[in-house]
């Protein structure tokens, strides 16, 4: 049987910009299919940015395909219930009818992917930034070095230099509001009585708008998402202003004290992108470079990993890279227009959306709408994702 990963007697080679979740997934999946892969990370080491992460069925299926699911499950957590609170009272409890999901620190997931990449023989270069790419398969590094490849993958984030150097047409939105994401000790004993193994989405609108997403990652680590309007100088301040948050969420004081100690905390605004195409010539964009998503949908990493994995699958079926890439995009690209406009609005005006839809219609219905948005993206991915044989 002909090995399509060899062309004119040579093994096909990929250069990948960016060693985040999308880049690592693409690197591992291609390497497992016989490619040689060089992965470029502009930083001095492989590390994850951010705090915690939710993975749903689609992302977990990718981890299974890569052979690291058990590694990731160890040291992560599935809450018994996803609760929604309104003014510090529980109004909704969802179990998602058995839909697989998991919470973990971003570093935990990134470490598992990085270990697998090295085990599979991916060549990883740190302090190596791709500053330019050409559709012919050529990349230029910050040190002036030029490299050639059968495939270039732009997994270099929202500010992708691979994407921008080629000139992909894009629409980009930055929201008026944002959030502070932190990992702190769980302090479960200090929190006292309560169901502190649950995810708890806490919404308050009076006397001011503040929200906390409480997400246990494992026995030791807690992921906190603290949301407030950018116009609120106290709620958006970093490091966090302890009194401001304890006043609204007094029962969380033990973990908020830990959060206030984190001097490197950031207030990040939501960013989303929409591109006309994800591929040109021998170049494919994945992850935030192609489809940065609103964190409220909790599908950015999962969809990035599915798209990266499916790219390798497509290239395993179609020998010609320039034929495989548009075929992959046609098959995998989510149709974001199918999402109701209310979900797209979350990304642009999160606080205004919350005020209108949660306070006026009830937190339970909003929780269900968020669930429906997640399930839409999960099913959009899993319908086209095939388990490796």
Describe the residue ranges of each PLM region.
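Conserved N-terminal helical subregion
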Residues: 2-14, 31, 56-187, 229-242, ...
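Conserved mid-domain beta->alpha element of the FAD-binding
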Residues: 16-34, 40, 153-154, 262-349
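Conserved FAD/dinucleotide-binding core of flavoprotein oxidoreductases
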Residues: 91-101, 105-110, 114, 183-267
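Conserved Rossmann-like nucleotide-cofactor binding loop
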Residues: 22, 45, 159
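C-terminal helical "tail/cap" subdomain of flavin- and related membrane-associated enzymes
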Residues: 2-12, 81, 255-257, 298, ...
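A structural signal for isolated positions on well-ordered beta-strands in alpha/beta enzyme cores
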Residues: 15, 38, 123, 223-225
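Conserved N-terminal glycine-rich FAD pyrophosphate-binding loop of Rossmann-like flavoproteins
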Residues: 44-62
């Amino acid at each position: 049987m002909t090995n399509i990963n060899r062309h004119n007697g040579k093994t096909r080679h990929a250069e990948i910009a960016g060693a985040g979740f999308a880049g690592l997934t693409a690197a591992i999946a291609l390497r497992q299919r016989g490619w040689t892969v060089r992965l470029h990370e502009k930083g001095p080491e492989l590390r994850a940015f951010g705090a915690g992460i939710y993975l749903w069925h689609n992302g977990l299926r990718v981890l299974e395909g890569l052979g690291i699911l058990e590694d990731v499950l160890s040291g992560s957590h599935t809450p018994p219930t996803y609760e929604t609170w309104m003014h510090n009272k529980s109004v909704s409890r969802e179990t998602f009818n058995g839909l697989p999901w998991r919470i973990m620190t971003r570093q935990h997931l990134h470490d598992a992917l990085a270990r697998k990449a090295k085990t599979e023989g991916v060549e990883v270069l740190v302090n190596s930034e791709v500053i330019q790419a050409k559709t012919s398969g050529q990349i230029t590094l910050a040190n002036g070095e030029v490299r050639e490849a059968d495939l270039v993958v732009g997994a270099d984030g929202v500010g992708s230099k691979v994407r921008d150097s080629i000139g992909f047409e894009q629409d980009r939105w930055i929201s008026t509001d944002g959030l502070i994401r932190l990992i702190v000790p769980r302090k479960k004993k200090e929190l006292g009585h309560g169901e502190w193994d649950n995810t708890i989405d806490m919404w308050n609108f009076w006397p001011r708008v503040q929200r906390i997403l409480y997400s246990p990652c494992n026995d030791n680590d807690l992921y906190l998402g603290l949301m407030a309007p950018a116009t609120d100088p106290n709620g958006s301040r970093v490091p966090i202003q302890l009194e401001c948050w304890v006043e609204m969420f007094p029962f969380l004081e033990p973990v908020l004290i830990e959060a206030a100690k984190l001097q490197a905390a950031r207030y990040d605004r939501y960013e989303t992108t929409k591109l006309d195409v994800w591929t040109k010539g021998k170049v494919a964009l994945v992850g935030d470079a192609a489809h940065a998503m609103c964190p409220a949908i909790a599908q950015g990493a999962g969809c990035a990993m599915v798209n990266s994995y499916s790219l390798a699958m497509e290239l395993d079926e179609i020998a010609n890279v320039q034929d495989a890439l548009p075929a992959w995009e046609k098959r995998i690209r989510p149709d974001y227009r199918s999402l109701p406009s209310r979900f797209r609005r979350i990304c642009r005006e999160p606080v205004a959306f919350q005020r209108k839809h949660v306070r006026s219609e009830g937190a339970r219905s909003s929780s269900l709408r968020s669930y429906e948005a997640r399930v839409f993206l999960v099913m959009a991915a899993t319908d086209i994702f095939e388990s490796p044989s």
